Amino acid sequence: ATVIPYFNRFIKNIPNIEKLSKFDNRKLIKLWEGLGYYSRVRNLKKTAKIVVKDFNKRLPQNFSDLKSLPGIGDYTASAILAIAFNEPIIPLDGNIERVLKRYLYLKKQIQVKKENLQEQKKIFGTSTKRSSDYAQALMELGALICKPINPNCKKCPLSKKCKSFKNNDFDLVKSIKKDKETFYKLNVYKKNNQYLLIKNNKFNFLKNFNIFPMEKINNPKYFNKDLNLKMSNMIMNIKIEYKNKYNLNKKNYWIDPSKLQNYTLPTFTKKIVKFLES
């Protein structure tokens, strides 16, 4: 529900693949602003260009061609084939994973690994005539009935054979993924109540976006952080240092913190500005 207004705004401005392939990059980022994962929107445009050029403006209808497109992996390719093209495939999203874990009562780490779940999902079978509806029905079953907390088993069509229901145990075992902890020194330059930002060509995260000048600190013995921010699978510990001098060039960018909403900036940068102003 949270992303619906973003989706509607996106489709209103970019109704088809051809328009997406030509859409102005700054306006595209502005439309995406607030959703995070900016690599996804960059990949969307890259994919749109390829689809227009190589596939006659239509998404390919086979797994290998779909996976060759930027940003499309196993799940997305499976979801497109099942939902858009009615292929007899079950895309393994978080909701279907949850149904599967409870239905089969999977309680060990080795059982909830992606490879095993891909194999076990075959128990749900497929539909040859209504594959799209069937795939979405399984997703909705997880989202609306087999919820993470307080599953509504009375309404579940699978409860009679569900092993978690039989054992009255609905706790879920999650595959352990430890976030990588990183350390950065962030340099703050302030002049006339404005902050200096630079275009990021240095780090893999937020590539080509405006961020504060930063330096990565590897394996520090002592690190007194001022704040930490979560980004994807990374926890960023940040130490802030105020500076007086900086080598200016045309790629520098000054922002007024009182007009933050007027700039096209990643949420990461906005959070730091708000922290500095608090």
Placement of each model-derived feature along the sequence:
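Intrinsically disordered, low-complexity, charged terminal extensions of DNA damage-control enzymes
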Residues: 128, 140-278
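Catalytic cores of DNA base-excision repair glycosylases
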Residues: 1-152, 158-161, 167
